[in-house]
């Protein structure tokens, strides 16, 4: 089997990001981003997606976290696009529901080649531990635009904002895991009647 790994660097005047991923990993993760709550959420992707993630970022967090969060999403999306390759043999679609106490979220993903994000999370607070939760929209938009996926994210219920967000990221990891899994019955075929994605 071809190794589904990628290492990507993205440098701008605002951030310098390095991202290495292994889609067939065991959930190992290492982060040096400087935004602890984002690192905590990225760890959920690795653990629940069984994806090895190594991400470093030096960003202008002295201004705020916006550029760092968005650019990590962009670079992670670029790494996914590179690692997934031509998409032959993958399940393509993934979905997951994840609860955490009172919170419940659903994530559905399609490695369609068509970027699109529908994200509906009615946060009950504007921040968690000083982190502006609106920035997760920027993270997922950056990921979607560069991984070329269609992504639907819905927090169905919850009143603890930390729980709302954590269920989203856990469900995202689980949905990714389903979508990128190789289907033995596809035997290297493209998962589309068009013959390409």
Swiss-Prot record:
> Which leading EC class covers this enzyme?
lyase
Cite the entry's keywords alphabetically: Amino-acid biosynthesis, Cytoplasm, Histidine biosynthesis, Lyase
A molecular function GO annotation: imidazoleglycerol-phosphate dehydratase activity
Identify the GO cellular component terms for this protein.
cytoplasm
GO BP annotations listed: L-histidine biosynthetic process
Q: List the pathway annotation.
A: Amino-acid biosynthesis; L-histidine biosynthesis; L-histidine from 5-phospho-alpha-D-ribose 1-diphosphate: step 6/9
Asked if the Swiss-Prot or TrEMBL record annotates the protein with the keyword Nuclease, the reply is: no
Give the EC number: 4.2.1.19
For this protein, the record's Gene3D superfamilies field holds: Imidazole glycerol phosphate dehydratase, domain 1
- Predominant location: cytoplasm
Question: SUPFAM superfamilies, from UniProt?
Answer: Ribosomal protein S5 domain 2-like
Its domain of life reads Bacteria
Matches recorded under InterPro entries: IGPD_sf, ImidazoleglycerolP_deHydtase, ImidazoleglycerP_deHydtase_CS, Ribosomal_Su5_D2-typ_SF
From the UniProt record, list the reaction(s) this protein catalyses: D-erythro-1-(imidazol-4-yl)glycerol 3-phosphate = 3-(imidazol-4-yl)-2-oxopropyl phosphate + H2O
Similarity section: Belongs to the imidazoleglycerol-phosphate dehydratase family.
Name used for this protein in its record: Imidazoleglycerol-phosphate dehydratase
Source organism per entry reads: Pseudomonas putida (strain ATCC 47054 / DSM 6125 / CFBP 8728 / NCIMB 11950 / KT2440)
């Amino acid at each position: 089997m071809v190794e589904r790994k990628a290492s990507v660097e993205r440098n701008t005047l605002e951030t310098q990001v390095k991202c290495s991923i292994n889609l067939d990993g065991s959930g190992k993760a290492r982060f040096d981003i400087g935004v602890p709550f984002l690192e905590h959420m990225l760890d959920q992707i690795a653990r629940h997606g069984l994806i090895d993630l190594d991400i470093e970022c030096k960003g202008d967090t002295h201004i705020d976290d916006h550029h760092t969060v968005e650019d990590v999403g962009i670079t992670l999306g670029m790494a996914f696009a590179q690692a997934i390759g031509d998409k032959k043999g993958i399940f393509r679609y993934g979905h997951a529901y994840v609860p955490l106490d009172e919170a419940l979220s659903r994530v559905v993903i399609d490695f369609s080649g068509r970027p699109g994000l529908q994200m509906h999370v009615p946060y009950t607070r504007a921040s968690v531990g000083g982190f502006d939760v609106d920035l997760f929209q920027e993270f997922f938009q950056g990921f979607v635009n560069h991984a070329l996926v269609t992504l639907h994210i819905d927090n169905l219920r919850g009143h603890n904002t930390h729980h709302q967000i954590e269920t989203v990221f856990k469900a995202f990891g689980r949905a990714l895991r389903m979508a990128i899994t190789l289907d033995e019955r596809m035997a290297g075929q493209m998962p589309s009647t068009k013959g390409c994605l």
